[in-house]
Amino acid sequence: MYAIIETGGKQYMVREGDVLVVEKLNYPEGEVISFDKILAVSKEDGNVEFGKPYLENVKVNAKIIEHGKGPKIRVFKYKPKKNYRRRQGHRQPYTKVQIEKIVQ
């Protein structure tokens, strides 16, 4: 059984027990959260139910494992003959979650 959830402006196909890296969520580590924006869910008999746009009465429970930062992205601007150089770095924060249960 799987579900398609939406979080952080992206969509993820998840199963129970999956470990997922999503955009940063403002919850402490170890807390159990619930995703309620469910786009689709498969039933035990193989049928798939789709929402318009989201399904009612379906939730996905997940536990927050850790928070972190992704690899450093370096942005370099350069204009020739003008002595213009700008270097900037960025590390995108993320949250790692483990899917515990798909509740229907």
Curated annotation (Swiss-Prot):
GO MF: rRNA binding; structural constituent of ribosome
Alphabetized InterPro entries for the sequence: bL21-like, bL21-like_sf, Ribosomal_bL21, Ribosomal_bL21_CS
SUPFAM superfamilies to which the protein is assigned, alphabetical: L21p-like
GO cellular-component term (any): cytoplasm
Keyword entries, A-Z: Ribonucleoprotein, Ribosomal protein, RNA-binding, rRNA-binding
Domain of life: Bacteria
Keyword flag Membrane: no
One biological process term in Gene Ontology: translation
Annotated function: This protein binds to 23S rRNA in the presence of protein L20.
Family (UniProt): Belongs to the bacterial ribosomal protein bL21 family.
Subunit description: Part of the 50S ribosomal subunit. Contacts protein L20.
Protein name as it appears in the record: Large ribosomal subunit protein bL21
Native organism: Thermoanaerobacter pseudethanolicus (strain ATCC 33223 / 39E)
Classification of source organism: Bacteria, Bacillati, Bacillota, Clostridia, Thermoanaerobacterales
